[in-house]
Amino acid sequence: MFELNNFDALQIGLASPEKIREWSRGEVKKPETINYRTLKPERDGLFCERIFGPTKDWECHCGKYKRVRYKGIVCDRCGVEVTKSKVRRERMGHIELAAPVSHIWYFKGIPSRMGLMLDMSPRSLEKVLYFASYIVIDPKETPLLKKQLLNEKEYREAIENYGEEGFVAGMGAESVQKLLEEIDLNQVSKELKEALKTSTGQKKIRLIRRLEAVESFRKSSNRPDWMIIDVIPVIPPDLRPMVQLDGGRFATSDLNDLYRRVINRNNRLKKLLDLGAPDIIVRNEKRMLQEAVDALIDNGRRGRPVTGPGNRPLKSLSDMLKGKQGRFRQNLLGKRVDYSGRSVIVVGPELKMYQCGLPKEMALELFKPFVMKKLVQGGLSHNIKSAKRMVERVQSEVWDVLEEVISDHPVLLNRAPTLHRLGIQAFQPVLVEGRAIKLHPLVCTAYNADFDGDQMAVHLPLSVEAQAEARFLMLAAHNILKPSDGKPVCVPTQDMVLGSYYLTLDKENAIGEGRIFSSPEEAIMAYQIGDIDIHAHIKVRISKEVDGEEVCGIIDCTPGKLIFNESIPQDLGFVDRSVPGNEVKLEVDFLINKSSLGKLINKCYMKHGPTKTSIMLDKIKEKGYHYSTIGAITVSTSDMVVPEAKKRLLAETDVEVNKIDKMYRRGFISEDERYERVIEKWTKTTDLVADELMKNLDRFNPIFMMADSGARGSKSQIKQLAGMRGLMANPSGKIIELPIRASFREGLDVSEYFISTHGARKGNADTALKTADSGYLTRRLVDVSQDVIVREEDCGSKEGFEISEIREGNEIIEPLSERLTGRYSAEDIIDPNTGEILVKKEEYIDGEKAEEVEKSGVKKIKIRSVFTCKSKHGVCAKCYGMNMATAEKINIGESVGIIAAQSIGEPGTQLTMRTFHTGGVAGSDITQGLPRVEELFEARKPKGLAIVSEINGTIRIDETKKKRTVVVIGETEEISYDIPFGSRLKVSNGDVISAGDEITEGSVNPHDVLRIKGPNGVKNYLLSEVQKVYRLQGVDINDKHLEVVVRQMTRKIKIEESGDTEFLPGTMVDIFDFQEENAKAEEEGKETAKGRITLLGITKAALATDSFLSSASFQETTRVLTDAAIKGKVDPLLG
């Protein structure tokens, strides 16, 4: 058996005929597969046992040798080696072709590699290969040119004129092979380099392409004539199996059909050659052989694909690699695993944070081998076989053993789709009755799970290492923070929030108001026996030990707050304990809602770490559920109070709208202005009605409580329930100017209802499209950044990246403190007012420091950033900064690339799909939401392009009747820009503008930014633009994730002049290779290469990665492999 598991790199190359014969165990001579009577493989056929090995373990074909004791003997009668049948998965055969044929990948791909090597167009090459024209191989003394094409008539004339011996011409792959053999790579390479120095334009591009191909062959020690195939390898039979179906029929892999066609045609050609058949017949047979081999390698690439029964194209070798069902994505990147199960989930509020309920039968099946081993060890059964029988019959002793086995063996729970790493977490299993998995309610947010029939899968980590990883890294109690922004993901929701909110409410004049209790316990007891109301204002005496001394004091509170604070550590920093008299105050003395719960959990995590936080969360969960039940908060129609003022407000607006219409009819205002004003009026009215409504609602109104606490619903939903629904959009997204006046409480009439359905339908369609788009974006992001890993502690980079707050107009999108937290400073940060050093160079900035810096009024700061990291593979820990998921410094080996891709991709489904139609006469559509993110990451030219100034200067606006022109007056030159009709200007006369600033509204083309502002400018632009989209949707993503991806997009340099280096002009090289090569050239006193950084979209960047396996598994599989094989690429298997 061929075992190969420990290797560091993979190389791919062209296979020479010798190599193929070396791999092979024998030649396949017949197209037969298996004998229809005996169902045994035919000798010398496609399933031959002599070539590929026995079909049954330790048994030869004729049955002379059976049993293991004959291992390794080759049978003297049938020639089959006695060995395991598993060898049929790895032994290869070959077919000796009677005439050479070309490999379609190298002849047909773009650019055609064969065409480049011979300097011929693919069309003329095709004529020669498929026997339509002759090609002159050696003109000798005749005036014919080498590689000249001749048709039948010209060929005959040439023979008449110069005789048969006068020149050599031929057709088919043989002739091409001869020409390829003649190529002297070193000589051609020299000639091309000389020619390059003088050429320009299209010619230069063609030369560069040829040089690239020639250099690939020269460096990789592949021979160009190996692109022509003399011998075809036959892949092992178990990779193209033939299986018997129930009806006695056979199903076979398409490859067998394709191989059979090749063998049939090859044998016929051999026979024809032996018989000395006329040229034209042989030629036809050769062409058919060429076509058969093409179909085998890549069916459908040239001409019509070969079809099987039912007109279905057969799957060729290339198709076996391509696409979601191909070898890469189906078998190498994702496999199905055993020791797994799936079932429906139900809520388990009684579980601890780190537990999950596992159904008994499922657990028994999953842990079967462990249970069997324990049964034998404990002497309950004598051997494994009887233990297995015990488990299968489910005898009573088995359950006790199962409990024992399960006790310290974590399991992994996963819910599809797994959008980020919190989609798989580890839990301690608890056996439950029934057949459903029980899930802790707090981890639902991370899984995005609910209990309306969702299913989850259970996996079992087997090895000790896997169990340790599950326990220490993946346990749900350790995964409290989101890797994308470092905020808690385990925030209580719905009932838990409502219960906590209810507990911390207070009420005037409640039963027992003003009473004084000697201790919290007494107060709580008084509440439990019904003496006082849970919301009553009371006074309580509290005594605490501070620094070994007892401190007493009386505080104002409510029984509810006392109960809530029992579960909260009293040192989280909500109360300043250093102030005298504050020692005994309650930590949480405010009304709890969803956002304050988030803050609470965050503070607890930062102060006490995950374990204590998970305990606190469990307590909050229990109290929340308990008190939301006791509060008995229900919803009824009487809770929706329609405000009195609504009628009056609607009547007033009607009058106003009529006035506007009148003005329009009299021609004072345009149609567009009228429309805008009407919309504005109704929007204002809707808001006024909503405000009236909110004023009317009682603090204890159940609907108000649900919305106010953040448990469910929002102000806008209450507005629709009891206020008015307001303006709706029609299917194209334009707002209909007639509002829906009714609320749901009053009921909609038919036309109102109809208008409402537009939005709902569009919403559903959008969601479906969005999910697919978002998933594809994530996949591209993963592919581009998957090899970014923290490789070293400090790369020693001296340059920093300058950051400031991100603004959109007057609105701060991302404050400076958020951008600073968890980073290292690249310079001393000095307080502009006092001049003291706030943060030293290379110092770590935590949350408190960051806020201090922001308050001091510093506007711009240089920090260590992934952008300026000098690590060649991956990044260093200092440039990356804090690990968002643990709030600690990042460890070496952490795969930050994948985390970045997931953090950007996972919220993708929350972004909107629509392009907003901006108001105004000629408002251009500004792309937003998911399409905008995609546009930025793919570095496309955006819709609604803005005009950008190329230089620094002042603005002058010239307006004539025909057009507007903006002139930028710089120090040395002035540039004028014509403004297209309908664009909105962002500048006015006399403004001072700097290079790269927008003159009109819209989106800037990132390639322009790169040209004008340089690499740092474009990095900053991409980062802040993507942030704007996400932040406007209320999604927080930390900068560093975007930095990782953008860095991958700006890693390549396009060579402009190669100097004395190995690079070829026009090629893309990695920025680090570029610097290394140039440094080497400088040392030796040679001329260095010149190039400029290019911006690649994520798809291109993923395909341009150094690892050909990564690119091949991503997209365009055949193209990537063709290229890699010629270059003889080595994949170092990093990442």
From Swiss-Prot:
Transmembrane regions: none
GO cellular component, one term: DNA-directed RNA polymerase complex
Keyword Protein biosynthesis attributed: no
Designated name of the protein: DNA-directed RNA polymerase subunit beta'
Protein residues bound to Zn(2+) 2: 795, 869, 876, 879
A Pfam family matched in the record: RNA_pol_Rpb1_3
Disulfide pairings: none
